[in-house]
Amino acid sequence: MFTVSRLIPDLASANQVLETMDLPHGQSILVQIFSPLSREHVVQLARLIRSRHPQACLLGCSTEEVIFQGEVHHQVTLLQITVFEQTYLSRAVVDYSDDEAADAERLARQLELTSMSRAVVCFSWQMDTLQVARFALRDTQGAPVPVAGGAAKQTPSGRWVLLDEACYQNASVAIALHGEALYVETGGYTEWQPVGRTYRVTAVEGDRVLRLDDEPIEAIYQRNLGAQADLPHDWLISFPLMKGECRHQDLYLPLGLAEEGGLRFNRPLALQDEVRFCFDHPSLTLERVYLTAQQLQAKQCQQVWVFNCALRLNFMHENHELQPLQAVAPTDGCYCWGELLYEHGQQQVMHHSMTFLALREGAVRDDLVPIPLPSYPEGMTSPLFNLIRHAFHDLDAMTDNLAQQIRAQTSLLTASYRRDRRTGLPNRVVLRERLANFAANEHLIALKVTNFNQINEKYGYPVGDKLLRDLSEQFQVFLDQKLAGQSGLYAIGVGEWATVFRAKLDGKSIHSHFYQFVEQLEHVNFEPYGLPNVDYLSISLCAGLVSQGDFAEHSPDELLLRAIEARRYAFNNNHHFCNAARLKVQESVRQERLNWLSRVSRAVVRDDVVVYAQPICQARSHIVASYECLVRIEDEGEIILPGNFLPIITDTHLYTRLSRQMITHTFNMMRHRPEAFSINLSPQDLMSERTLQHLEAAIKSVADPARVGLEVLESEQIKDYGRMIEVCNHFRTLGATIIVDDFGSGYSNIDEIVKLEPQVIKLDGSLIRNIDQDVKQRRIAEQLVKLCQVLNAKTVAEFVHNQTVCRISEDMGVDYLQGYFLGRPSRLG
């Protein structure tokens, strides 16, 4: 192999330069031309070269910077000539089509790739066409063939790629190197580092990304890069997006703004992909280049062709990254606008990278003495970027650790809501989940100790609590003996249990088994079970049965209600057991429900909605901070509390009509008052477009919308959390404060509350009411307050009914207090 390279300042001096080149005879001659000349002038140069060397194969592309013997030169033409002794060449040109794989097949077919093909050098007319599939070439045996090269750079004289004596546009030109004696080595260097936070792809169409984290991607790029609306192309490609871990270097290059909106990328991202901005500084590759130079020297490479990214010149003001390669072998090449790299068995399209193709003809010689390589230059840039990279890594680790701690704490809190604190059994929440999958041949029994209140009053709460644990063990033993692995036991109240089990038994047989168990249990003296101070303690049980075959279409709540109603019926009629299927619909209950529906309907028609307000006070000072506005209806002079009618009308058309009247009355009374106030929104309100439009108009009518708070009850009735979050975010933009109500109640989906990002969270009264007596409840409340602080939300303690509860709540760090101790609801005048 013989190699020589020359610089040509201009076309006029080309003849003089060519006369100085005396080429030896060889099997093949490859002339690579890298030049800022126009298409017409470079064709003249090509014809001049072919007139002197008609057998030569010419290949090249437009550029403004070339690499000549390891040095960077600007605005000159480089001729790089290689004479091969044992290698033959093939050439190809392929116009682009929409089928990238088909383009690759045509390119491989024209190049006649075989098992003797060692490498391909290819230049593409435009960076946008650098798609991996277009350059993933294989020989006739299906083995991959490395492809090096890149995309032509736009110059003031135009952009072109050259093959022999013709320039091409919208095409790729290539030559293939074939020869058993030819050894090639490929490599590349890039050090893309993720910068900043992680974004999630939330809207994408093909190769266009429209939104990250539900925000237009153009706005995110403009904000982070400090760019104008047009987003310069150089800026875009300098900051691609990285998916996954840094070590994978999985990059997505923004190609430009799309007319349809969004940014177009070199390959498509998927919905929900997580990405980060990344940035590369070429000085980070220097150490790796020096290591590669040592390896190439050991392989006795005779020629190195470098295809470098033009953007690297913005950072590499010297030729440090080229010096070690030039010390190994003559190093020539050009600066491209995108680079092709074959590494680790895969063809890749690189950006912001330096790639090389090193060659040798013949075997390694033992008599050659290696030339010492230059010393590695010391500098501060590489250590600085390493420090920045590790700082980001440490920050990510801290964030992950904090997230794990919050998840662990949340799991503990969530688990405490799913377990009964007295018995340790799964509670009503878990039972409801189980009943959601109530299947054939399954049965539900609701069970209660009917004399438990008397036991508590006579023997005290410690004795009662111990009895609950002992009874739970007795029930579990019975179930394990009779229905091993086919039953579950749940605590659904104080002295109340439920069991779900599978058995091919009818109601009569189940009644018989239960009766025998009750007869046996009621004659047990529980003194041996840890009650030494009790001479004799007996219990009385009753139960209600629901079988799936009788109530196949009922919801979990209805199933449990049916079982409890059957149990109550048994107790009221002095029985141990009642099958819900035997109960007839109680006409009085139905009539009462119809009566309430009639009264509410009458109140809505007459617009007899009454607004009450209860103060919410600042902790410590007890100054009124706002009012919670509460609905009442007036019927024939009687003020009716919502607990009497809301449960009945929840699933009817009356509910949304009542909500809109409540909104109207509340805003009419509060519009000209100075105090802040809040109203309650149910899941039905959040799903009603008419109610939401009515509420929006009311908020806009207030001079200061920041006075308005919207209390959202986060419950299992919410089916579409995305819609709820969307609605709340909309009202937040109008100025309203988003408040989560009853947090910590039997149902709280903490993940969704985190996504909702409320400004205020109200702790459920069931947690606060007994914190002066129940230490465990107090600890749970304390943890919830801390969790709210992590979420950057203010907290309100509800049901503050005495001074002790008030003081404890303040000590826990709540921001506001609400309850009878501070003020009862009163009618707004």
From Swiss-Prot:
Its EC number is 3.1.4.52. GO terms for biological process: regulation of single-species biofilm formation. Keywords: c-di-GMP, Hydrolase, Magnesium. Induction: Is up-regulated during biofilm formation, and is also induced during a late stage of infection of the host. However, cdpA expression is not regulated by c-di-GMP concentration. CDD domains: EAL. GO terms for cellular component: plasma membrane. Residues 419-480 are annotated as: Degenerate GGDEF domain. Disulfide bonds: none annotated. The EAL domain is required for c-di-GMP PDE activity, and the degenerate GGDEF domain is required for full PDE activity of the EAL domain. The GG(D/E)EF motif in CdpA is degenerate, having the sequence GVGEW. This is Cyclic di-GMP phosphodiesterase CdpA. It comes from Vibrio cholerae serotype O1 (strain ATCC 39315 / El Tor Inaba N16961).
